[in-house]
């Protein structure tokens, strides 16, 4: 299993006002690999990650998953996006009226788990990040760091094949950031997932199999 990014370009605007943001991005990520995207603000990192997740269309280029187009209009590709890609954003976006456990079991049930399976997975993942005591808490009862850790667990609930993360440790202290990255990496390795994460925290680079540096829409360390 691999993710192949082939000559991805993205521009915003039209005609003479068109602004290129990505200028031909190429790289591969194999199963079990954890890749970090790094670069200054405006380098194109978030645009690239958003395209990889299917939330934004590229202007040109291809994204292949197991040598097949990742994003098409057919039903199989839609199911892949729903069930096999896990997103972790800077903000947690938790549902305010659901308790922590329900935030997770809802995702599990949507992915086809039984309630028992969803409960077990939620409890296992929360224990790994030290939040098993917060099962019945509502989002407003959590700290910013706790909310983000719940969001990370939520992205892992449905056993995704691809994890895309945008600064997932930005609201965490150094100790918790390390715990979370170790958890994400262990999941990627043990479940043979593909992991791509944006971070500015160079202390976390050592956990990556490779670091891709972007500058002004191009990869500079290819």
From Swiss-Prot:
What's the stated role of this polypeptide?
Answer: Part of the ABC transporter complex hrt involved in hemin import. Responsible for energy coupling to the transport system.
Answer yes or no on keyword Transport: yes
**Bilayer topology annotation:** Peripheral membrane protein
> Which Gene Ontology molecular function entries are recorded, alphabetically?
ATP binding; ATP hydrolysis activity
For ATP, which residues are the binding ones?
A: 39-46
Could you give one GO CC term from the UniProt record?
plasma membrane
Q: Give the species.
A: Staphylococcus saprophyticus subsp. saprophyticus (strain ATCC 15305 / DSM 20229 / NCIMB 8711 / NCTC 7292 / S-41)
Where is it chiefly localized? membrane
Q: What is this protein called?
A: Putative hemin import ATP-binding protein HrtA
Question: What does the UniProt entry say about where the protein is found?
Answer: Cell membrane
What gene makes this protein?
hrtA
What PROSITE patterns does this protein's entry cite?
ABC_TRANSPORTER_1, ABC_TRANSPORTER_2
Residue intervals of the ABC transporter domain: 3-222
The record's keywords, sorted A to Z, are: ATP-binding, Cell membrane, Membrane, Nucleotide-binding, Translocase, Transport
